[in-house]
Amino acid sequence: MANKDHSLDEKIIEAARNEFLEVGYRNASMRKIAARAGITTGALYTRYENKDVLFASLVYETGLLFEKEFSALKPEHYRIAIREGKFSQLTAHEAGKILDIIYDHFDECYLLFCCSEGSTAEKYYPLLVRSKAKQTARFMNSNGMAIPVETVEMLMAAQYSYYIEVLKRRYTKEQATELIRNVMTFSDAGWLALINDKL
């Protein structure tokens, strides 16, 4: 069996990234990606079983970064922050970390959150929000705040949609930081009002 020509991998990744960024997953074509990379469609399928596998290879590592960041912030961190009056400082820290990931991996984030319709990666964002919402609802309920997980999930979906808007509008990091700071001021006030009402 002939050895795979790994020198083509970079060309394929670059071609795929550009194709998906320009037309999205649904409208992207393996034939066009192969042509962009200067290889045959057969050579492309030798490396990637299908379009979905190729798309996933571009966004998988970035998805892991978000999961790692979200799992690092434990419920007890919120408990302490609320008790010490530092809730806004904690959410600002989390927002900063999310923006760091976005702007360190902008194209990959744009693909994952704005171009993934029709791919298996399309499910990533709602699953991420649902997981975060369940974690938050468990924390709130365990601390005497009877808030349905559905309520938390809707609030979380609205909150994280700010970041998708930043991506869609292609703001600079400086612009995004200022915008997110403003909307988090609004969001934090709502969360604290809800928390205090339920305590």
Predicted regions and their residues:
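Hydrophobic alpha-helical connector segments
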Residues: S57, S71-Y103
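Short, hydrophobic secondary-structure boundary micro-motifs
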Residues: Y110-F113
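Short, solvent-exposed beta-strand-terminating loops
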Residues: E61-L73
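N-terminal intrinsically disordered/low-complexity leader segments
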Residues: M1-K4
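Amphipathic alpha-helical packing segments from all-alpha helical-bundle domains
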Residues: K97-D104, E117-N143, E150-A157
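C-terminal peripheral helix-coil segments that are non-catalytic and often amphipathic
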Residues: D104, K134, R138, V152-L199
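Alpha-helical DNA-contacting segments of helix-turn-helix folds
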Residues: A56-T62, Y124
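Helix-turn-helix
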Residues: K11, A15, E19-V53, S57
